[in-house]
Amino acid sequence: MADIRTYVYGATYDSWNRVQTMTYPDGEVVTYHYNAAGQVESMTSNKQGRQSVIVDRIGYDKEGHTVYTKLGNGTETTYTYDKQHERLQVMNLTADGQTVMENSYRYDAVDNILGITNAANPTSLMKLNKAKLGGRSSHTYEYDELNRLIHASGKAKHASYDMVMSFGRIIAPLIS
């Protein structure tokens, strides 16, 4: 016989129909805090009477893009955007003052991602990462004339991948 369980969660909303709280099946209540512009500014948790900070602060630029986040564990991320196209160009993640991720992004004329490069050096993370996980990596993507992903490849440390996709041509329309 199958082990069937029901999980119930709840949510409350403010007068602007924004989530105020989410209650999870284990009793944890996550509260969302908003700035004057109505953007999420921070998130806190209360589980069995223990308060904790999930997201300490989120900063936005005048266009509404997220430019800074600080999590409850102190991890900080900064985001830099291309002013002309408003696309994410660089994302830097730091923890304990050390760079964990340093991603840069490349796009084509229709905003397909062509490449992602992480320039972070895992050997500089000895305090955080004794196993030397992560670090430098690069990924490239190609699209067909309909902007469908047809090729992806990448390399990280001693591993690499290469994926090729193809799409069939529809000869006759589907009839229902």
PLM region spans:
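Beta-strand elements of repeat-based all-beta scaffolds
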Residues: 1-176
